[in-house]
Amino acid sequence: MKVYLDGKFVESDDAKVSVFDHGLLYGDGVFEGIRLYSGNVFRLEEHLERLEYSAKAIMLQLPLTRKELSDATCETCRQNGLTDAYIRLVVTRGVGDLGLAPWLCPKPAVFIIASKISLYPKEYYDNGLAIVTVPTRR
């Protein structure tokens, strides 16, 4: 599987993120979960708009334009020969010192993963499944 990582397509085994990336250390970043149906990325423009809004909310400067993110997302799917998939587009604050200061992270990181989606087994569609609801607010 090919992964988009900071401007390059690399094999998933070679896709490395630093342990000093603030996305890993502090959850400092934004992401979108997107679907690919019959070779078409579902509502990509709306997803990218929401990604920009989320980044702005945490004062994270996206390192790519909306068109560049769109092209990279579509190319990730193409490189993997996918027509139906789940796409995860992630932008992290990037590598920095320990500590919460975002200005110590000079370069945001971008990675995009697209993979064949594994949905529920057929028996769940035929028979349903048990669920639980909880009052936790997100």
Q: Which positions does each model-derived feature cover?
A:
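Conserved alpha/beta cores of soluble small-molecule-handling proteins
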Residues: 1-138
